[in-house]
């Protein structure tokens, strides 16, 4: 493992390590309290994790359509949980605790574009958002607000589609197959103005402001990097879920590779390196950026036509594979303890069907990530292909972040790590690995 870490350092585009990354941003989804069984997470189970975290981001608040006010997505839970969470500062006085808005948890089928509506709103309506945010934050003892706005996403690439002539401009190179927001330039300017107004109000109240760039939200469309970065205390890039079984049901590939693999018509922006470099090349200080790592994996259902090797890109997949027994996700999401329980542990054990273990394939190059698979049987059933970052690969990414001169790592999120120690007996193995290799 140590040899592999030194190896990847040689692949970095920097020549020296000038500092130790210091930020470890820990996301906590309050919905984890509502889960059943072993997936249910209580606030007292955060204590062990918070000795490693510099910031805790509590998710998620929402944006009220019409009035555009910040509001709790679960009043019955949050009316108690908000203050329980901020009270953790008594045990961890150096911990900064922020409330995140959006984060793909603010589901509003009647107003799916309400975050764009906030950008387009007049100054009075935007002030409702600012004022309501300050009231909610101050009333409950939060240190600041994290903007995880649910903005329009890149369209997924077309299966077997041609990339044409590699597009006619850099912007098209970064957008995927289609432009989904023809008013993107206007929205970029509006977002910059809104953030400036929020920052001005927060500054007088001594409140922090951070940005989370959600997966597949196009930075070239919405973020004027040179103007934006001075307004934020830090910026978290959720550099994962580039491909998922929901977005890409007919082909499976690495969900969060570090580097671009120039094969099989992959899109060149679907990797960590491209996302980080875009912000750095647009004059964002590295210390403002935190690399986002997922503590979960994504699972596709394999067909007989998907073959036996599992080497990505895997074709003829059939969308989402069944979730694990703890999270029970309908989106092909498996937490780390769910993943490790599916990997082969006992070579002598004989299981068939859905109980048969998955065979893990480790990426010896440490560039793209690990995967595991169970080919479909003769009837085309029980096939699974799973992409994930295990504790070792999360450590590799921590080393990468140090080498790029970034501020640190953002872990999405604590409730998907093995907070009960079910895999090996050690609790929070992904978080621990990140902290160890950050130094």
From Swiss-Prot:
Localization annotation: Secreted
Annotated signal sequence range: 1-20
Domain GH18: 22-439
Family matches, as CDD domains: GH18_IDGF
Main location: secreted
Keywords: Developmental protein, Disulfide bond, Glycoprotein, Secreted, Signal
InterPro entries: Chitinase_II/V-like_cat (IPR011583), Chitinase_insertion_sf (IPR029070), Glyco_hydro18_cat (IPR001223), Glycoside_hydrolase_SF (IPR017853), Glycosyl_Hydrlase_18 (IPR050314), IDGF (IPR015520)
Effect of residue 186 to Q: In strain: MB08b, MB29b, MB40b, MB45b, MB47a, MB48b, MB52b and MB80b
Similarity annotation: Belongs to the glycosyl hydrolase 18 family. IDGF subfamily.
Function according to Swiss-Prot or TrEMBL: Cooperates with insulin-like peptides to stimulate the proliferation, polarization and motility of imaginal disk cells. May act by stabilizing the binding of insulin-like peptides to its receptor through a simultaneous interaction with both molecules to form a multiprotein signaling complex.
Full protein name: Chitinase-like protein Idgf1
